[in-house]
Amino acid sequence: MELRSNNSTITAPKPKGIIDPNTGELIGSDDRFFRDINAELSDKGFLVTSADALITWARTGSLMWMSFGLACCAIEMMQCSMPHYDNERFGYAPRASPRQSDVMVVAGTLTNKMAPALRKVYDQMPEPRYVISMGSCANGGGYYHYSYSVVRGCDRIVPVDIYVPGCPPTAEALLYGILLLQKKIRRTGSIER
């Protein structure tokens, strides 16, 4: 949140939302029912919020990922899970089953023979599901781009949300991709997806 300065007074910007054209105020800001409930519950330690904001907050802090390591990028993905980087501090924990995971990290060269397996695993993931494409080979074929047996990017098989470039990308780059995915989830919410 950015603070605006008006001479010597610092004020926060008005909250964003749907504005009533008649009054110029946010819709629901003058609703006595919600004002009374908020006043009654605020001193008891309760927070009144929308369900979408609560779901989005919980989802960004508890992303369960499943690795789909196909080549050398998978080693950097494993390094990201080690204590030096510790991606679990961001709520990004590994899962072995696609039915328990929210994020699939495709790391490495995707061949034509492996593409149906990738799609099958992706279809087993529950909604909302996200895909991080890690490395040049997963992004666009990489070094093997002109080979007859390589898919030129995993986005031809599954929809990709975040691309992490590099050959192989560093663990820091993957962590940055994870943080970008969390930012994307916060921005889009769960209902819009």
From Swiss-Prot:
Its EC number is 7.1.1.-. The keyword 4Fe-4S applies. Residues 1-11 have a biased composition (Polar residues). GO terms for cellular component: plasma membrane; respiratory chain complex I. Keywords: 4Fe-4S, Cell inner membrane, Cell membrane, Iron, Iron-sulfur, Membrane, Metal-binding, NAD, Quinone, Translocase, Transport, Ubiquinone. It is a peripheral membrane protein. Its cofactor is [4Fe-4S] cluster. This is NADH-quinone oxidoreductase subunit B. It comes from Bartonella tribocorum (strain CIP 105476 / IBS 506). The gene is nuoB.
